[in-house]
Amino acid sequence: NLPELLKAALLEQGYDVKDINITVGTNYEATGEAMAAGTVDLGWLPGGTYALFSDDVDVILTATRAGLSNDSEDPKTWNGDANKTLKNGPQVTFYRSLIYATPSAYGKELAAKVNAGEKLTWEDLDKATWAVQKTSSSAGYIYPSMWLMANYDGKKISDLSNVMPIDSGYGTAFSYAA
């Protein structure tokens, strides 16, 4: 089990730890609040949550991850069987967030525009129904908001007409598209 694996790994590094208690927070904010209150000793969180609680916590570990075979900023190069993306790239220190078009009629219309090389207008995006995560989610809120601001005259997710907050995970978010 994970506590035993952690104890063994720490012992290899010269740390003889007797007890490890692992809990899973109900969401990023709850974990950040527990860290700020001192009711837990360590937490593993995305950068967006760190930004909210940075006055109360310190970073002690960072991790990299394998990059993807596709690192293009051109959305049409991510689509279709010929552009299948694999997790076989080099270690990277960044995080990529993607905005997906669902199989809804309007989602297909937006995807067709992008795949034809057309830039989506603010009106195109504003007409869509957006599923987003909590405001502390890097990939599910912060990065898409930053992308909108950079590409649509400072507009943000909060400026969109049809936003559906999803706070129960990405799987649930995708199930709404079905």
Feature names for model-found ranges:
Residues 17, 37, 45-47, 54, ...:
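Extracytoplasmic
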Residues 114, 126-178:
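Pocket-lining segment of extracytoplasmic ligand-binding domains
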Residues 1-18, 146:
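Short, polar/charged alpha-helical segment
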Residues 23-43, 51-56, 169-178:
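Short helices/loops that flank or line small-molecule/ion binding pockets
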Residues 44-56, 67-72, 145-150, 178:
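A ligand-binding cleft/hinge motif common to bilobed small-molecule-binding domains
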Residues 1-3, 27, 137-139:
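Extracytoplasmic "Venus flytrap"
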Residues 65-138:
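A conserved helix-loop-strand patch within extracytoplasmic ligand-binding domains
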Residues 1, 18-24, 127-132:
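Short, well-ordered beta-strand elements
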